[in-house]
Amino acid sequence: MNTEATHDQNEALTTGARLRNAREQLGLSQQAVAERLCLKVSTVRDIEEDKAPADLASTFLRGYIRSYARLVHIPEEELLPGLEKQAPLRAAKVAPMQSFSLGKRRKKRDGWLMTFTWLVLFVVIGLSGAWWWQDRKAQQEEITTMADQSSAELSSNSEQGQSVPLNTSTTTDPATTSTPPASVDTTATNTQTPAVTAPAPAVDPQQNAVVSPSQANVDTAATPAPTAATTPDGAAPLPTDQAGVTTPVADPNALVMNFTADCWLEVTDATGKKLFSGMQRKDGNLNLTGQAPYKLKIGAPAAVQIQYQGKPVDLSRFIRTNQVARLTLNAEQSPAQ
């Protein structure tokens, strides 16, 4: 009878109460049980008070209770009915997994990026080609226009040019024809050309005595000499001396151009006068003189070599870009665009 009564009394007690009673019978404290089971004191207290911590899974709680029962010498079979009530097994909530592949997403993104890159590259190449074609076409049109304009100017000048007839009238008296005074520096008071004793050849009355404009002025210190002496045959004497004739000096601002291929060219000086405008053929050369600075338009810069003030002019920047050269040569030989 006593055994059955004890058994019924144990069944009436909860799992936590039975564990607490067994611990007290063994003289153990909650701190000692927690140290032996490697648990927190709060966890031991919750087990004895039949509390199930919310942050503790039921599987772990069952394991702690079984360890506690073995420590206080209580059979596990006696605690199983109470465990079902105190720590029932709860179904774990598993979040549904998304069925996608990170590799596929990355590969798809890389594909779009590569497509966009190729598209941008094709657009840039197309725009560059269109710009080059338009620039080349504009240069060709400009060269053609300048060549046509030059041809029109040349044809207009040829139509306006007329030959001036010489005055061949026979009414001119050869005796009245006189020569300009020769450039003679004398210190004597009277200078007269001696008469020619030898017979002179007959002179056509229609011919006029022409004196070169390069003769200098007469600078005398006494009475001027007679302008002409008539020979017995009526021929005008030749001047005996042409002092003071100066040799022409080369212009330091001369523009020298040598052509290695056919090239259209236009040169204008500071006064706006066109020194040259037209087409120059291969192996040709051109020597121009005017008032600096010069403005040049060259259709093919690679086909011409320019020297200004004895120094070559650099056209490499126009040759590299294959453009019509527009430059100005000033007195300091600094070509400007």
Swiss-Prot record:
Key words, A-Z: Cell inner membrane, Cell membrane, Cell shape, DNA-binding, Membrane, Signal-anchor, Transmembrane, Transmembrane helix
Positions on the Cytoplasmic side per record topology: 1-111
GO cellular component, one term: plasma membrane
Database matches in PROSITE patterns: HTH_CROC1
Periplasmic compartment spans: 133-337
GO annotation (BP), single: peptidoglycan biosynthetic process
Domain HTH cro/C1-type: 19-71
Location of the protein in the cell: Cell inner membrane
Gene3D superfamilies: lambda repressor-like DNA-binding domains
InterPro entries: Bact_Cytoskel_RodZ, Cro/C1-type_HTH, Lambda_DNA-bd_dom_sf, RodZ, RodZ-like_C
Traits of the deletion mutant: Affects the lengths of both the long and short axes of the cell, but especially the long axis. Cells become shorter and fatter and form round or oval shapes. The deletion of both zapG and rodZ genes causes synthetic lethality.
Subunit structure: Interacts with ZapG.
Task of the protein: Cytoskeletal protein that is involved in cell-shape control through regulation of the length of the long axis.
Protein name: Cytoskeleton protein RodZ
Organism of derivation: Escherichia coli (strain K12)
Upper taxonomic lineage: Bacteria, Pseudomonadati, Pseudomonadota, Gammaproteobacteria, Enterobacterales
Gene expressing this chain: rodZ
